[in-house]
Each structure stands twice: as structure tokens, then as C-alpha cells.
Amino acid sequence: MNVTLSSDQYNALNELEYWYRKGSHQFIDVSGPIYTGLWDVLQVFLEYAGLDPREVMYLSYDQRTVLDLAYNRYHGYYIYGKLYKYDRNVDLDSIPVINPHSTHLSYTWTKRIRQKIDKRYRLIVVLDASLLNERMLWDLSKYGLPVVLLRDPYLLPDADSYIYTREPNVFLEEPTERMARNPVHTLAYSVLHDKRLTVGSFQSANVIRRKDLHMYNLKSSSMNLVYTQEMRNIINDAYRNTMKRNPIYTYANERVYVADSHYQEILVNTIEKKVKIYLQKGMTGTLTKVNRHAAITRYVPCEFQPDYYHEPFTELVLDRDYLLRRETKSRQLIPDDVVKFEYAYALTPQLARMNHWNDVTIIMEQVQEFDEKLAKLMSYTAITRAARSVTVVI
């Protein structure tokens, strides 16, 4: 791989090589922000280690990243789908045939780790490892393969993330020359290092004042990010109002966020069977079909297409009470499986962690409850969700 490495990257490369050839630990934790070029270091390491790309299994929480890896002939998998199998356990007392007083089928999901993975793999790489918890580390260890954890220390972590109890083995901080030429990465660096954001256009990174924000900015973005749920609700309502959406109805072509996981719903790529898309919490996309309904109807059949995929999930049923943030006394029979959607014309950084979009608009807010460190993590996480361009509103 023809890449000029920085001194930080060389140190990381040496640590990786020593660990792989002589190390006594199964895991190595490599930490670095987006502008330090972790991916480049990893690819040079794999080349030096003599590992064929088909011998490396990549795991990620971001299903668009998984698809990007697959399109580039890497073996990428959605981490929950690859590591676990899911069993639906139905409460027998909830089956109407058995219990005439039951109004709906009740069940829970249990997961169990897959006992085997393809024998061709010699190394596992987890791309967004700061979202892992200790239990998942333990499950990964059961395969007996060396594991590289690529951790972004400034990505908002989960409350049960392993990073609170484990220090990284290798830490990169120096921006690479190539990454420094990326305006989005430069903006992320500025936020972390307390550099004041200056109004102006810097190629694919733009900073504008709040008074200059127009609905055009929001509509032209792949995703809008805000810091609070209150602001998110305001933008979602305003966005629907500009599209002349009656607030009591649900329409096709609306942007939504999946608020709960449905382990049985899987799209299998027709060309490459190993490429699968899972209907999981955190996914965003479009309602491509919504059956006609009355204003009071709660459960409505629909179809949902993820942002980054060409096929929709079909034969779904959405809960309109949850979507519209209301409570009604519905007399409908409750379907066995109901999907909870939220409008997704805007998200918070916490909800956006497992995604990325081409063009992102961020409306920065001063939130009293946020300390300085949390505010930095929120801003950094929001900026790094942009793959191509970002507009920051200050």
C-alpha cells in the first residue's frame, strides 16, 4: 500500500506488528480520532503481516460501513448479526387460542453467540470499538482469533462501554498530512482543540450564523443533527409543515428512524448472499409505502427502505401512536410484530452514532446540562457523521 505514514502511525504500526508476531494478548486496542489515519495504519499492517483481505473479518455497528466494505471486496459484517443468533420466546399465556382474554401475542428475544465462524479468518477487526461492552469482548474472545479494536476516543460511548475500564494499548493524536487536507476532519480537529469556529466556506466544510439558516439548508442535507430532543421535535414538526403534511396522518416518502430492533427482519443481497441488512435500532430511511388510514388508526401496514440500500423491508406494521407522540384508545387487534418509528428530519448525536451520511447540517446549541467535555464529544460525534460535507450553524 503506497501511503506515507506519520511518526504517530509508524509507532502504531510497530506496536501492531510486535503484538501480532510476539504478543501474548488476544486483543490490541488502538485509539485515535478520525484525522489520525487508523485505517491506513491497519492496511499497512495487514500487508506486512502477509494477511490476505479474505482472511480478515471486519465488524461494525454502522450498516452503511458494512456495505461500503462489501462493495470494496472486504469481508464486512454487522456485528450483532455476525456474532449472535436470536430466538423468539413466546409467552404461551398470550396466545389467543390458549387464552381467550389475551389481546396480543407477547414474546421476548434471547440471543446466543454463534459457535463457529469461517475457518478462513485469521484476524478480527472491530471498527467502532468504543461502542463495545465487556460482555461482547468476552464473546469475541471465544473464537480464539487475534482481535484489533479500533477505538475513536471522542465518539460518544455507550454507558456500559468497555473504554471506561480499559486504557488503549496504542494512542494516535497527530493529524496525518492527507487527513489534514480533508475539511471535515479539520473541523473535527478544531472542535477538539478549542479553536474558535470562523464563519465561512472551507470547501466541503461550511460555518454559518443562525440568522442565515434557511429551510433550504435543512432540505439539502442528508441528515440534520441537533443537541437536544426538544430542538429535534421542533425541526421534525417544521419540516413536515413545509411539506404540507397534515400532522394527524402518516405519508409515504417520510424520513424515519427505527426505534427498536426486529431481529427476524433481514434483507439478503441477491448478488452476494453474505451481505445482509438488519432492521435494527438506529437505522434511518424512508417509508416507501404507507396504507391509507383514518386519523385515529394506530397500526398501519408499511414498507421501509434504509438510506443506503436499494430494497425496502416489506410487510411491516408501524405504530402511529408512537410515531406521532400521542396516546389513543385503539380498538384494533394488536399485530404480532409492530415497528416503532420516529421522524428523522433531525437526530441527536446519540441517535446518530451508528450511522453516517454524505451531507450533514449541525445546529449547535448551548445546553446548560452539558459540561465542556460532553459538549466536545457531542460536536465531534456530529461532525464525524458527515462522509462528504458538513454545514455547522453557530
Enumerate the predicted regions with their spans.
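Conserved helicase motor core of P-loop NTPases
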Residues: V3-L42, A49, W138-D139, Y143-L145, ...
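Core RecA-like ATPase module of SF1/SF2 helicases and allied nucleic-acid translocases
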Residues: T36-D40, F45, L59-S60, L67, ...
